[in-house]
From Swiss-Prot:
The modification N-acetylserine is found at S2. Residues 1-11 have a biased composition (Acidic residues). The lineage of its organism: Eukaryota, Viridiplantae, Streptophyta, Embryophyta, Tracheophyta. Residues 50-130 form a coiled coil. This is Uncharacterized protein At4g15545. Residues 197-211, 223-233 have a biased composition (Polar residues).
Amino acid sequence: MSEIEEEEEEGSASAITGSRSFDLPDELLQVLPSDPFEQLDVARKITSIALSTRVSALESESSDLRELLAEKEKEFEELQSHVESLEASLSDAFHKLSLADGEKENLIRENASLSNTVKRLQRDVSKLEGFRKTLMMSLQDDDQNAGTTQIIAKPTPNDDDTPFQPSRHSSIQSQQASEAIEPAATDNENDAPKPSLSASLPLVSQTTTPRLTPPGSPPILSASGTPKTTSRPISPRRHSVSFATTRGMFDDTRSSISISEPGSQTARTRVDGKEFFRQVRSRLSYEQFGAFLGNVKDLNAHKQTREETLRKAEEIFGGDNRDLYVIFEGLITRNAH
């Protein structure tokens, strides 16, 4: 018995010595078995417990990390969808911007076109306003100078065309003198005296125009269309043409031309200038009438010849107003002679 006790004491002493060498606490050494194999078995169990605990902790931590990763992935997907929506909005905004730029360019071109149209219309309105003022002044002058000057000469008793002689029983119907259309002169004849029909007509004075109405004269057609009948017909046909002009044209006067033509008619036809211009205004457009006025003004200002004036007048009147051109041509041609 004593030997066994000694061995146990030696074993415990060696265990204590080993614990001291491994720095194990005394409490643990007291509960450890003395057999080394049993100590290894205890150590294995302790290691298994430690590993199991560590693995459980790591698995728990891994699960938490997976949950956090899932949340981050979800946030990433949300952010990615938001980025895609923003990119779509940006693309739509660029498309709208390009459309707005194109519309802006179209509006700029349209604005420029409308501005040009407005300027052109303003110029047309200014021209029409000036034309209207000219017509109003002409009509006012026509109203103030009521009636046109009439020159009617007494024919000779025989049938041949003889010069007219003024009658003693002449009556003055107009208080303003009438001047004839001055013929157009060339550029080198500007200093020459300008002939006028008033020099060849038997006018009483330059301020009054007598109307010579001899007894026994045939019917006379005046501007108003009222015939004045007499008792004795004659064979020659005499035309008294009165040419009324507007302000700024033919120097604001009315010109009368007496034309003697052989024939068998027994009446005198009188073409009134005022009525002629009314026909011209009513039958021509504003542009044509303005061109006609400018043509006559150029003739009076000696800027063009009589032939050029007639050519332009023929283009203005055209084929539909051939009668007006014939009257105008007769007035200018006879005045030149």
